[in-house]
Amino acid sequence: MSDDRKQIKRALISVYDKTGLEELARTLDSAGVEIVSTGSTAAKIADLGINVTPVESLTGFPECLEGRVKTLHPRVHAGILADTRKPDHLNQLEELEIEPFQLVVVNLYPFKETVASGADFDGCVEQIDIGGPSMVRAAAKNHPSVAVVVDPARYGDIAEAVAQGGFDLAQRRQLAATAFKHTADYDVAVSGWFAQQLADDSVASAELEGDALRYGENPHQQASIVREGTTGVANAKQLHGKEMSYNNYQDADAAWRAAWDHERPCVAIIKHANPCGIAVSDESIAAAHAAAHACDPMSAFGGVIAVNREVTKEMATQVADIFTEVIIAPSYEDGAVEILQGKKNIRILVAEHEVPAVEVKEISGGRLLQEADVYQAEGDKASSWTLAAGEAASEEKLAELEFAWRAVRSVKSNAILLAHEGATVGVGMGQVNRVDSAKLAVDRANTLADSAERARGSVAASDAFFPFADGLQVLIDAGVSAVVQPGGSIRDEEVIAAAEAAGITMYFTGTRHFAH
């Protein structure tokens, strides 16, 4: 027998699912294992004619509060948590007249099944197990001394361990890992359900508070806006124009994030959550707007404009000449709002910038949560990029590449963005392969403005790696002078070879910016 096996002399069993219980109890009883059990589990074992110690006999305290309190007692948990490798623990158990457990068998109240059954709120809450997870976690923590089993499918392993003199340490560790995952999944189910209840309450509350929108993405969809805190697009103050729509809010948020991705004065023009144009300028915010608009004047018609600086009268005059749905900025120069108000329907918003912490997306059966994608990764800094091909870029060219890299984050994947002199000149978005995105970016650069072939001499950013050299080759053939991309493809060497052959500069960031 291995030295690290723990002979099973005493077992604690508390199970909601009684599958396999009879065979397990008979196996333990025939091996002379003392069985301590709770409630209906103890009753079931006793009905089989097997010796069992009810937990209340152990604790000297009756089950109470409709079974809510059964095992939450020091005489139970000390027996589970005592590290029998430590003489001090053994001495304390002896002083307290507590016997240690070597095996804990627990499965939990069927919370997921109760929710799936359509039970009401109180019914679901009643099926949140408290004592069970406490015992499981205690036993898993103390796996050097205790084996914990949470799945009836593993009862055969218990029988085998009893025959072999107990579970060895490696087996107990594996059982502990399984147990911690079991309780973690259980807690996620409970917390997710509670979050859903609160979300439902929030939507209902928002409707009652008058935050309902005219309709959703389409007229047949109901919609509302739930405002939290005092900053960001949701809490923007509207100075003029028609009521904000669901789509207005979506595009305003996309534009707001795109503009604030840049530290320099920036204007982003968005339509259907994709950039028509983004530009920065240290000369003036009006110059940035003119450059952003020039990227794709046709698409900018009816777009949403976001600005990360004060809107000047000069810029307001430019905007007033173009049909614009929404403009959002942190402030407006005296007289700028009056100029914009010359357009009856333009929605003029003023907002305080907020960096989102978490993004939430509803999916069938639940929701996805992730840390918001802002420029926080180390690879987002040009100083950390790796030169993969060609000569190192000049300071001016590197600044162009960094602008393109910051701008491409706001483009729906697959995303290729061409830039020149601090402005986008061609954007390829939302294609299911990177070659088509590259072709689209080049086509838009060369056909959507008065000056032909804007792609030639521009720089390019790709939100993810090129899986083959073909996407890069489209950019090379169009005359792109430098490229920044994450790298990381298994065919990086082919892509690098294509860049080297063309004599262009290419940097790897090591960071990806997918946007779906």
Swiss-Prot record:
<dbReference type="GO" id="GO:0004643">
    <property type="term" value="F:phosphoribosylaminoimidazolecarboxamide formyltransferase activity"/>
</dbReference>
<feature type="domain" description="MGS-like">
    <location>
        <begin position="1"/>
        <end position="150"/>
    </location>
</feature>
<keyword id="KW-0808">Transferase</keyword>
<dbReference type="GO" id="GO:0003937">
    <property type="term" value="F:IMP cyclohydrolase activity"/>
</dbReference>
<dbReference type="InterPro" id="IPR036914">
    <property type="entry name" value="MGS-like_dom_sf"/>
</dbReference>
<keyword id="KW-0378">Hydrolase</keyword>
<comment type="pathway">
    <text>Purine metabolism; IMP biosynthesis via de novo pathway; 5-formamido-1-(5-phospho-D-ribosyl)imidazole-4-carboxamide from 5-amino-1-(5-phospho-D-ribosyl)imidazole-4-carboxamide (10-formyl THF route): step 1/1.</text>
</comment>
<keyword id="KW-0511">Multifunctional enzyme</keyword>
<dbReference type="InterPro" id="IPR016193">
    <property type="entry name" value="Cytidine_deaminase-like"/>
</dbReference>
<dbReference type="InterPro" id="IPR024051">
    <property type="entry name" value="AICAR_Tfase_dup_dom_sf"/>
</dbReference>
<keyword id="KW-0658">Purine biosynthesis</keyword>
<protein>
    <recommendedName>
        <fullName>Bifunctional purine biosynthesis protein PurH</fullName>
        <ecNumber>2.1.2.3</ecNumber>
        <ecNumber>3.5.4.10</ecNumber>
    </recommendedName>
</protein>
<dbReference type="Pfam" id="PF02142">
    <property type="entry name" value="MGS"/>
</dbReference>
<dbReference type="Pfam" id="PF01808">
    <property type="entry name" value="AICARFT_IMPCHas"/>
</dbReference>
<dbReference type="GO" id="GO:0005829">
    <property type="term" value="C:cytosol"/>
</dbReference>
<dbReference type="InterPro" id="IPR011607">
    <property type="entry name" value="MGS-like_dom"/>
</dbReference>
<dbReference type="InterPro" id="IPR002695">
    <property type="entry name" value="PurH-like"/>
</dbReference>
<comment type="similarity">
    <text>Belongs to the PurH family.</text>
</comment>
<dbReference type="GO" id="GO:0006189">
    <property type="term" value="P:'de novo' IMP biosynthetic process"/>
</dbReference>
<comment type="pathway">
    <text>Purine metabolism; IMP biosynthesis via de novo pathway; IMP from 5-formamido-1-(5-phospho-D-ribosyl)imidazole-4-carboxamide: step 1/1.</text>
</comment>
